[in-house]
Regions:
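Short acidic active-site motifs
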Residues: 372
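Alpha-helical transmembrane segments of multi-pass membrane proteins
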Residues: 2-254, 266-269, 277-281, 304-314, ...
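Alpha-helix N-cap and loop-to-helix initiation/capping positions
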Residues: 290, 397-398
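Soluble small-group transferase modules, centered on the S-adenosyl donor enzyme superfamily
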Residues: 221-283, 288-295, 301-307, 446-545
Length: 545
């Protein structure tokens, strides 16, 4: 007996009894949309510890996911026309779910493997290329499969042209509502509460359950469901609370907040907070309470650049408090000065009390630095801007408008000190942009390079004699280590000559500028390790790591 195409489709749908109820089709669309957004947000958190959470990385994630969804839409539509068997759709959902469940288990290894391969072969734009390739390898396939859902469901749910608009509109509404929930739940609930790995597992489990309901109700595909369930359970065991920095087994703390990946490590001398697996130190605390040897020591010059006022009588504001390294050092060396900090990540503030001995009398407000300045009227003797992290430089805290706001909150002869964490030497680099922007607001600018690092400290004030004031006050301090450090800052500082590289709220290309400096730093490291490899072979390379 032969059947027309329409009759074949009806017979297929009759075999899949649960699909006679359009509610299940709508729920499929709902959970597919929810899972796509959850995976997208999870992707940003998986990549951030390795490549940063800059706008560039977000662009790569969104772009690759949209490519995957578009290809999935095309394939799903053609597949549904060619063979309108719902088994194929729910099989694809099952495969996508398994792939998503595997991400916590193998994702970090894929990222590091791709980085290792590319670092010796890519001459520029390493972070962009590495993040793009990692995103393509890890996320395109499962989201391509989920992209086939909508056109397939349209095929199964439209019975006649009379109500086709209503049916397609309802499918779109369920997809959109699911996407909204898939946006808010990971960000505000699952990632802060249980982490990125379990977030992937939760939404993979939802998709497996969805496919299981279909296959079990149709009395087909029980083996597929059983195998998927076993793989999912294994992924839960292997991927649960797995470390991003899996090669380190001596971490005091590793976790996530709404804003950051967080890692605390310590040895006999110091405690370190990092927000990136591969590079950078976000905060540091010396257990003996002394100087750190890092940029915080150079920033200590700011209170000593103010004439005719004792440091202990000053009030200091820190934008980008971190774990309070600067505040702790100021308390030790300058006595009972008034210090308050602004930190957007309250989990970092909690870590500062738990691991970094932040003094109890240092007030920390959980807020965005610029928004905080807009909300207050107080003025300060010193304002430290330390909100720049790897290549994640907030554009709203690097513009003329922002630095004008800082200036308005400084007392007479007050000093703004800015930690610029990526020192570049080429024309038009990120530091030149920042320095020129600040110089367009402040009368006098002094900079000093931090020894042994990529940091540069910038001091801005209306006081033309900042360096001379620093020398005089340094010689009067009762701490010999601080005096020597401050005299070193004075000796190595230079007056900045302003240029025309200005950033505004409307135009501040901080991500691209930061990426250029990171590329230069990476290439410098690659040349170093290549030389070791050519001289001493693989053994020498391993010993140097």
């Amino acid at each position: 007996m032969s059947y027309t195409r329409g009759e074949k489709e009806r017979r297929i749908m009759e075999k899949s009894g649960i699909l006679k109820n359009k509610l299940f089709l709508y729920l499929t669309e709902f959970f597919a949309g929810m899972s796509v957004m959850a995976v997208e947000l999870g992707a940003s958190r998986l990549l951030a510890p390795y490549f940063s959470s800059s706008q560039i990385v977000w662009t790569i994630i969104i772009g690759t996911i949209m490519i995957a969804m578009a290809l999935g839409n095309i394939y799903g539509g053609k597949s549904a026309d060619r063979s309108p068997d719902p088994d194929k759709l729910y099989r694809r959902i099952l495969i996508a779910a398994i792939w998503i469940a595997l991400i916590p288990v193998v994702g970090k290894y894929i990222i590091l493997g791709i980085s290792a391969l590319l670092i010796f072969t890519v001459s520029s734009n390493f972070l962009i290329i590495a993040a793009f390739v990692a995103c393509m390898v890890i996320f395109v396939f499962p989201l391509f499969l989920l992209g086939t859902v909508t056109p397939s469901l349209v095929k199964y749910s439209v019975d006649s042209l009379d109500d086709s608009g209503k049916t397609v509109g309802t499918l779109g509404a369920f997809n959109t509502i699911g996407s909204i929930i898939g946006t808010f739940v990971p960000t505000f609930v699952t990632i802060p509460a249980v982490g990125t790995s379990i977030t992937f597992l939760i939404f993979a489990g939802i998709l497996i359950a969805l496919a299981a309901v279909y296959f079990l109700s149709s009395h087909r595909g029980q083996k597929k469901v059983a195998v998927s369930a076993v793989i999912f359970v294994l992924c839960c065991g292997l991927g649960y609370s797995d470390s991003f920095a899996f090669w380190q087994n001596d971490l005091s703390y590793e976790g996530e907040s709404i804003y950051n990946y967080l890692q605390v490590s310590e040895d006999d001398r110091r405690v370190i907070l990092s927000t990136n697996v591969l590079f950078g130190v976000q905060s540091l605390y010396m257990k003996d309470g002394g100087l750190t040897g890092m940029y915080y020591d150079y920033a200590m010059a700011a209170p000593l650049m103010i004439p005719d006022k004792k440091a202990e009588d000053m009030n200091v504001l820190i934008l980008g408090m971190g774990t309070g390294t600067y505040a702790t050092q100021c308390k030790k060396y300058f006595g009972d000065m008034s210090i308050e900090g602004v930190e957007i990540d309250d989990k970092i503030t909690a870590l500062s009390r738990q691991y970094f001995s932040l003094p109890d009398d240092v007030k920390v407000t959980t807020y965005d630095g610029r928004a905080y300045l807009q909300a207050i009227d107080e003025k300060y003797d010193v304002i430290m801007v330390d909100a720049y992290q790897d290549i994640t430089i907030p554009f709203q805290m690097s513009s003329v408008e922002f630095f004008t706001m800082v200036k308005e909150h400084l007392n007479e002869n007050g000093v703004m000190v800015v930690n610029m964490n990526m020192r570049g030497n080429n024309e038009g680099n990120i530091n030149q942009y920042l320095s020129d922007t600040i110089a367009s607001v402040f009368d006098h600018i002094v900079t000093v390079d931090v020894d042994g690092s990529t940091n540069r400290e910038l001091y801005a004030s209306s006081n033309a004699d900042m360096v001379k004031t620093l020398e005089n006050n340094a010689n009067e301090t009762g701490h010999s280590d601080l005096r020597d450090m401050m005299l070193h800052v004075a000796d190595t500082s230079s007056v900045y000559e302003a240029g025309d590289y200005i950033m505004t709220d409307d135009k501040a290309p901080v991500e691209l500028l930061g990426m250029q400096v990171i590329d230069q730093l990476i290439q410098g490291e690659v040349v170093y390790y290549k030389d070791i490899f050519e001289k001493d072979g693989i053994n020498g390379l391993l010993e140097s790591l």
